[in-house]
């Protein structure tokens, strides 16, 4: 069997140039939902997220951020071989919003997607 390695530095949300089931390993480190340094990236991809923040509906914002990531996971799943692995570097988010300390379990949202 011929083996080759290729590093692709691009968004995992569009892997249309990669055939289905052809990848054995995906390593990705997406923007973390509900971590302030990544807010603007999510706002740019879906302006409704900024509106959710303005309305202080942080749960809706969190869900919409994961909707964005889910598009990437769909593509990863499509290109992944049956015996392949996806390694996702992401952490949970802790954040004080208003006067409330919140935990946003990013790992759980991703696990739920893949189950």
Predicted features by range, described:
Residues 1-115:
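S-adenosyl-L-methionine-dependent nucleic acid methyltransferase catalytic domains
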């Amino acid at each position: 069997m011929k083996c080759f390695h290729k590093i692709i530095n691009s968004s995992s949300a569009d892997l249309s140039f990669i055939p289905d089931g052809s990848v054995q390993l995906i390593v990705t480190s997406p923007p973390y939902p509900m971590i302030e340094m990544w807010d603007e990236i999510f706002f740019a991809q879906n302006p409704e997220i900024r509106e959710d923040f303005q309305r202080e509906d942080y749960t809706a914002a969190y869900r919409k951020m994961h909707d964005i990531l889910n598009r990437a996971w769909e593509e990863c799943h499509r290109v992944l071989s049956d015996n392949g692995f996806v390694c996702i570097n992401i952490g949970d988010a802790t954040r004080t919003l208003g006067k409330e300390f919140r935990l946003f379990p990013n790992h759980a949202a991703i696990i739920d997607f893949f189950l």
